[in-house]
Amino acid sequence: MLGAVMNIGEKLYASDRKDWRRWLEANFNREKEIWLIYPSKESGKPRIPYNDAVEEALCFGWIDSNVRHLDEYSSAQRFSSRKP
């Protein structure tokens, strides 16, 4: 279906590495996935660098995967726990 809005589940905006790590510490063993929001440069909002997000996720056994465009000012990337 062209033009359909995709439901991507629970989203999180973390403005920096510390916010992302705090969320992971509290939720890595309770949640199966989270879609981390990346604001565009044009939005003017602070954003966690991709490499920082991946490094923190790996510390908790999580990996990155799909990216989805949300709107003209943001996208979201799926992070989830690795399969054992």
Regions found by a protein language model. Give the residues of each.
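Charge-dense, helix-prone N-terminal extensions
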Residues: 1-84
